[in-house]
């Protein structure tokens, strides 16, 4: 059994030249809702998302003045980022429990009949594990277990599937730590707070001026 390669963003079809990512970040793209390695930067007040495996033509941009109508939109963007999901180590399959969130490599057919499949990554929930004795090849332990999962994203959302360790990545629990992303999201959130305070102040009745109070007192 040859040793597998599970590099994030790998495709069966020819891939564009890789771009240098910010380590440890992945992003759920708006175009296909799949997860990709990425890095971010704030340029001229806009958030730029740059994919690890695509050219800059595929970059996604977020404009604070056009893409956010409420604080909920900020939360939705925040949920599109997380720490990198690492491939499941063959020796650690026993750590998985039903209900765990996984990120799985899926072969997505190309647009044409003869196009090769592209590997894209979508989330799924682990339902059951069928344990099996592990093999050892050239001194390396290789998991032979089977994992029953149900996809929560992508073209197979809601579908159940049985997969092997080769396609399984583990979704981290800890939040992402990226200064550029955090600063951008916090700035947009603060703008909503300022707008709310301005609207509240505008809705309050104007306080009486001292001269009007004196006129009212003299009339009494």
List where the protein language model places each region.
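Eukaryotic chromatin- and chromosome-associated nuclear factors
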Residues: 1-220
């Amino acid at each position: 059994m040859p040793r597998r390669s599970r590099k994030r963003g790998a495709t069966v079809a020819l891939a564009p030249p890789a771009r240098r990512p910010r380590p440890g970040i992945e992003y759920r793209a708006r175009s296909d809702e799949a997860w990709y390695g990425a890095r971010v930067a704030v340029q001229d007040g806009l958030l730029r998302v740059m994919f690890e495996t695509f050219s800059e033509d595929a970059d996604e941009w977020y404009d604070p003045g056009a893409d956010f109508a409420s604080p909920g939109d900020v939360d939705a963007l925040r949920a599109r980022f997380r720490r990198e999901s690492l491939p499941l180590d063959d020796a650690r399959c026993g750590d998985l429990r039903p209900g765990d969130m996984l990120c799985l490599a899926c072969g997505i057919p190309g647009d044409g009949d003869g196009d090769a499949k592209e590997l894209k990554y979508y989330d799924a929930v682990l339902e059951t594990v069928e344990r099996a004795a592990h093999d050892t090849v050239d001194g390396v332990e290789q998991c032979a277990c089977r994992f029953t999962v149900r996809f929560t994203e992508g073209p197979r959302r809601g579908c159940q599937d049985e997969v092997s360790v080769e396609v399984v990545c583990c979704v981290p629990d800890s939040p992402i730590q990226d200064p550029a992303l955090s600063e951008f999201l916090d700035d947009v959130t603060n703008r909503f707070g300022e707008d709310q305070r301005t609207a509240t102040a505008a809705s309050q009745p104007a306080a009486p001026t001292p001269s009007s109070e004196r006129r009212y007192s003299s009339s009494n």
